[in-house]
A protein has these predicted regions:
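Double-stranded RNA-binding/processing signature
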Residues: 1-235
């Protein structure tokens, strides 16, 4: 059953009074609905494009203000985590935006309103609607209210620097060691087995479906082993 957006529901989502309800309804209108409902003439795609830009800008400024002393690489990685599709889809799910998506009968029957990509798009479109209706300040307030609420975003886990390859490279430089070499030990049944060698000596192995992730896992494994050795009682 299709649920059309009410002004009360829109204002509950945004957290303030709105001006143009049609903008918010468009934010939840999938292009498949345009043929089925003659009252809808535009889908969320344009608003999603605008919202994507606004979200990126606000999160970039937010990270810079809070972590100005951090290196650019860390800030870039943190921003990527905060605006990636997986994060946005989870936020949209927790906001119950799936119940507001308007699409054709086939889409609803196949539960496409719960598709992570569509949830990501409608969240960005909602931000776009707020920006177009109320301006950047209200869009920023909405975004930061969501992102600073641990119910929606686990900021602590996202802000952890989990680029273990970079960490290992810096570790080697501090120790005046040669840089680590990542060697493909095997590629079997869709899994990459990556070995790390430092100064021609094997130090750790990582396994994953992608070569890139296997390298990260191998670097992480190195630090895990070092931590275990440090805490081990040899007596």
């Amino acid at each position: 059953m299709v649920t059309f957006l009410t002004k009360q529901r829109a204002e509950q989502l945004v957290g303030t009074k709105i001006k143009n309800l049609d903008l918010y309804q468009r934010a939840f209108t999938h292009k498949s609905a345009l043929k089925e409902y003659e009252q809808f003439t535009e889908s969320f795609e344009t608003l999603e494009f605008i919202g994507d830009s606004v979200l990126g800008f606000v999160i970039t400024k937010f990270l810079f203000d809070r972590h100005e002393s951090k290196q650019e690489g860390f800030l870039t990685k943190a921003r990527t985590k905060l605006v990636r599709g997986e994060t946005l889809a989870k936020i949209a799910e927790k906001l119950n935006l799936n119940a507001l998506v308007i699409m054709d009968e086939k889409g609803l029957r196949n539960n496409w309103n719960n598709n992570p990509k569509i949830l990501e798009d409608v969240f960005e479109a909602l931000i776009g609607a707020i920006y177009m209706d109320l301006g950047l300040l209200h869009a920023k307030e909405f975004i930061l209210r969501i992102y600073q609420d641990p119910k929606f975003v686990d900021m602590n886990s996202i802000m952890v620097d989990d680029n273990f390859k970079d960490k290992l490279m810096r570790h080697c430089q501090i120790q005046n060691w040669p840089l680590p070499e990542y060697r493909v030990a095997a590629h079997h049944e869709g899994l990459f087995y990556i070995d790390i060698h430092i100064n021609d000596g094997f130090v750790s192995r990582g396994v994953a479906k992608s070569k890139k992730q296997a390298e990260q896992n191998a670097a992480q494994s190195y630090f895990q082993v070092q931590e275990e050795l440090k805490n081990y009682n040899f007596n």
